[in-house]
Structures are given as structure tokens and as C-alpha cells.
Amino acid sequence: MSKLTPWWSRKSQQLTKIIPWGTENVNTFQNDVIAKRVLRTRKVKLNPTKQQKMMLMKFADAARYSYNAAVSAVNDKTHNPNKIELQNAFLSLKRRDGTYNKFFQKRRWLLGCPQPIRQQAIFEAANNFKSAFTNLKNKNIDHFKMTYKTKKHQRKCGFSLGIGTHLKHNDGVLIILPRNLGQVRYFGSVPFEGKPDAECRIQRDPYGDHWLLVPVYKTTKTQTTKPIVAIDPGVRTPFACFGSNGGSKTLGEDMNAKLTDIRTRVSLVDRRISKCQDVSLKRKMREHRRRLFRKHQRVRDAYHWEIIKDITNEYSGVLLPPFETQRVSRMLKNKTNCSMLGISHFTFRMRMKGKCEEKGLLYTEPTEEYTSKTCGVCGQINYLLGSKKTFECFCGNVCDRDIHAARNILLKWLSTEAGARVVETFLASRSS
């Protein structure tokens, strides 16, 4: 016996007649946003010399040691997780009263690292403790244990060094930490002239590339009048979109094909590495494997930003439900899991959220329960849907599964109180 979905209501029955199935010049959303300044990070690729790379590695070791010393002091309860207290204990050689800090008695090598880098590492430890205690107070976690940073993890995953505002860019010349690094070569353009507006960082990624992270202030737009769009995240179809004007499309299928090809090549290299006996050849193949992973990440990022640009330019609001990757991965096969994890739905969602905030667009994360199985015409649940690509209902509704789910996400959100103002706008646009 057929059954109505839990969120289907009388309002849903009215809205499903209002929301068109085909593209129409109606149902736009007036998005009034107060203009404000938001902080966004821009990446500039650096090309340091061999000597500068070695200096950065030494600075990273000193920053890691300072971080671990601060964590150890708080864990042993010899110091409180306070920035000023930890800074006085582990940063300066000479105190204000003229005495020398005993911490540096056998650790003079730390003084070779610039003070801003060690200071940011100590502040990072204090901020981590503050976040952990806040989560504990809000009962988000039951307990926590602050662990140390390891050299192995740093060599494998890279590092990030805070350099504050100790850099300048004039006439195409970038100087970072003048007393240590000096002039550093870079690719592209630097988003500031003179001194930066906020504290910057130097990052080394897992693939050995160095980046300068520059925070930049941007002003949001004040008003947009365009349709809103609901996005259904998935694996076979990464992003299915349905707009309030009836327009629909699927995005990310090309990305899936390219990422699958790269993963296939990685698997082939892995098999060759497992059978190889020559040490030098095995090292070369591991380097080749690392380059493939870097290509995988760059292809994914390029498609992410292309899709985000396409959506944010065409619509004034985005409805993007969270995709529970961890829960879904338990029910899928290994090959499908690799495809799902390669899409990086969480990273895409965070990027979309930041871009919507930057452009002053509506962004919300509604729930998506029963949106795939529910008929968008009669509200009945189709228990026989399974993994079918096409949705079919006894009422005669036949539609693409993912597009239909995206339409139901939009319909479900408009049926809630949060979408009440949007519904009024829709009705006004229909009557005018």
C-alpha cells in the first residue's frame, strides 16, 4: 500500500503546482543583503631556492618543537592555556625584568627561527586548547587529549608557518622575513601592494609545493534578483541542480570520469611498486604516484571552482544538503567508495558556503530525507526505487532520479517556515 512521505503536507501540494518543471521566467528570489567586508584567503605559489627550502624546513622543526612544548606544559598543568603565559614561558630569551629564560638554556637552536613563527605556533596550541574546552563545555565531546605534532606527519603532510605581516611586495618584488628568507620568487600575482592587511602564512603541501596564504578583504554585493537552486549531492551524478524557475542540469560527470582515470593509473603504479625489487626504480615510481595524487587534487579543485562559479553567477540562493559520506560509505562497495571520497563533498560544501557569503547570496543546508523516494506530484513513497536512474510513479510521473530529488529538496525547504518568505515572493511574481 502506498504511503505519503512524512514531510508532504497541504502546502507541499500547493507548491508543487507553483514550481514549474520547465524553465520559465518566474519565481525569482529578491535577496537583500547588507554590504559587509569578509575575509578570504588567496594562495600565491612560491618558488623558493634550495637554500630557502632548507631554512623553511628548519623553521618548521622549531615551530613544531615550540608547539609541543606548549602542549606538554598545559598537559602537565605547569602552565595555563593562556597565550600570554605560554608566550612568556617559551618565546623570549630575555624577560622584561632582565632575567634570562631557563627554557633556552639547552635549546639555543630555537633562537635561529624567527620569533613570529614560534609565536604563531604557541598561539596555535593555546587556540586548540580553547576550542577543545569550548566543545567540552557545550557537550559536543565527552573528553579530549591534546597530542603532539610529529616529524613523520610533517614530512608526509606538509606544514604551515605563521609569519604575521613580516613581508612586503613592491614593484613585483616579494620579500618575506627580510632578516632570514629575503626575496622569494613566485608565480602569478600577489593580491596586495606594500604591506598585507592581515597576518599571512607559508604552507608546504604534501606534494612539496610552497604557497603564500594571503588574507584579503572583499565587500559583498548588496542585492540580487535571480532564482534559487537546490543541489542533490551524489556519487553517480555528483551535483544535480533544480532551480525555482524550472531549470535543471547535472554537473560534475566529466570530473568523475577524469578522476576515475587518474585513480586507475594510481592503482597500476601501486601494483608495479609492490612487485618491484630495484630500490631506485621503486623510488621513482613513488614519486610518479605522488605526482598523480597532486594531479587528482588539482583536477578536483578546478572542477569545484568552475561549478561553484557557474551556480553562483546564475542563482541568488543555494540549498545544499550535507552529504553524510561516513555513513554512506558503510553501505557501498570499495570502487564506489573511492569515487565518492574523490569528489570531496565536504570540501565542495565549505567552498560553496564561503563563495555565497562572499557574493552575498542565500545559503542554507536543509535535510534531504525521503527526497529521492518521494513523488514530486502526488507525494507517494516509491519503495521500489533502489538504485534506478529513472524515477517512476503510479501517478504517471517519470523523471530523472537526481533531478527529481533536487526538486523535492527545493519543495521540502519551501514547505518549512524558513522558506515562507520565499513562497510569498513566488506568489507575488506569479500574480504580477
Curated annotation (Swiss-Prot):
Pfam family, one: HTH_OrfB_IS605
Keyword Metal-binding: yes
Induction line: Expressed in the late phase of the viral replicative cycle.
A single GO molecular function term of this UniProt record: metal ion binding
Chain positions recorded as Zn(2+) binding sites: C375, C378, C393, C395
UniProt keyword Metal-binding, yes or no: yes
Keywords for the protein's UniProt record, in alphabetical order: DNA recombination, DNA-binding, Metal-binding, Transposition, Zinc
GO biological process: DNA recombination; transposition
Family statement drawn from the similarity comment of this UniProt entry: In the N-terminal section; belongs to the transposase 2 family. In the C-terminal section; belongs to the transposase 35 family.
Protein name according to UniProt: Putative transposase A625R
Organism: Paramecium bursaria Chlorella virus 1 (PBCV-1)
